[in-house]
A protein has these predicted regions:
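Subset of outer-membrane beta-barrel
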Residues: 1-241
Length: 241
C-alpha cells in the first residue's frame, strides 16, 4: 500500500529571540510518503513494515530523511480485540537542515516503541483504544529556558503522558468512521495555566471511496494554534486486480 501525509504549518511571522516581530512571514511544510508491506501469518497474526521518505521545508531550510516502521498485529478470531506492537521512526536524516563545521548536521529520527490495544463492542458501532508510546524511555519531561522539569513530574502524571486514549465510531459497513482521542502528554506540555483550550484532544474521520481511503483530522496545540491533517492511501494490489 502507499500513503501520503502532507502537513502545512501555514504562514508564520518572523520574530527575534525575544518574540518581537521583525516583519514578513514564512512557511513551513512536511511531506511524508509511506510505502507499506504487510504479510499475514496465520489467521490472527500479521507483520508489516513501512518505508518513509520525509521531506521538510522550513523557511529557506530543507531536510530529507528516511525512516522505517516495523510492527506486528494480533486479533482474536472474532476481531473484537486487537493488539499491536510497533517500532517507529527507525532512521536518520540524509540531508540536514544546516551545516556544522563544514559538514552536514544529521540527526537520528525520534525512535518510538508503541503498544496498542483496542476493543470493539459487538452490538454497538463503538471501539475503545489505548496506545502506550515511548516505551523505550520513562522520563518524557524536558528542560526549558526558565526551569528544569526533570524530577518535578509526578509518577502518575508521567505514566499518563505515555498514554493516548481514543474512541471510534465505526458503522457496520465500515465505509466511514469518526474518531476522538486524548493525548495527555500534549495537553500537559501545551496547555497554558491561564487559558482554556482543547490542547491534547483531536477529532478526525475518514471515508472509503472505491479502493481509496481519505482521512481528515483536527487538533488544537494552543489557544491560537490549530493543526489540520489530511491523508490519502490505497492498496496497490487491490488497484491492479
Amino acid at each position: 500500500a502507499v500513503g501520503l501525509h502532507y502537513l502545512d504549518h501555514g504562514q508564520m511571522p518572523y520574530a527575534d529571540e525575544y518574540g518581537n516581530l521583525t516583519g514578513g512571514t514564512f512557511t513551513a511544510k512536511d511531506i511524508l510518503i509511506q510505502l507499506m508491506y504487510a504479510r499475514q501469518l496465520g489467521q490472527t497474526f500479521s507483520i508489516g513494515v513501512a518505508l518513509k521518505p520525509i521531506l521538510s521545508f522550513y523557511e529557506s531550510y530543507s531536510s530529507v530523511a528516511l525512516g522505517m516502521d516495523i510492527g506486528g498485529h494480533y486479533h482474536t478470531p472474532d476481531s473484537s480485540l486487537h493488539l499491536g506492537l510497533a517500532l517507529r521512526n527507525v532512521g536518520w536524516q540524509l540531508k540536514g537542515f544546516y551545516d556544522e563545521y563544514g559538514f552536514q548536521h544529521r540527526e537520528m529520527l525520534p525512535l518510538n516503541l508503541e503498544l496498542g490495544i483496542n476493543y470493539r463492542l459487538k452490538h454497538a458501532p463503538l471501539r475503545f483504544g489505548m496506545t502506550i508510546h515511548n516505551l523505550q524511555r520513562w522520563d518524557l519531561s524536558y528542560p526549558t529556558a526558565s526551569q528544569d522539569l526533570g524530577g518535578q513530574v509526578k509518577w502518575y502524571d508521567m505514566l499518563f503522558r505515555h498514554t493516548i486514549f481514543s474512541l471510534d465510531i465505526i458503522p457496520k459497513s465500515e465505509r466511514f468512521y469518526l474518531t476522538l482521542s486524548y493525548n495527555h502528554r500534549r495537553r500537559a506540555e501545551m496547555q497554558l495555566a491561564d487559558q482554556r483550550s482543547l490542547a491534547g484532544f483531536a477529532l478526525g474521520g475518514g471515508v472509503r471511496i472505491y479502493k481509496l481511503r481519505l482521512g481528515f483530522a483536527f487538533s488544537q496545540l494552543t489557544k491560537s494554534s490549530y493543526v489540520y491533517q489530511a491523508s490519502l492511501s490505497f492498496d496497490i494490489q487491490s488497484m491492479l486486480k
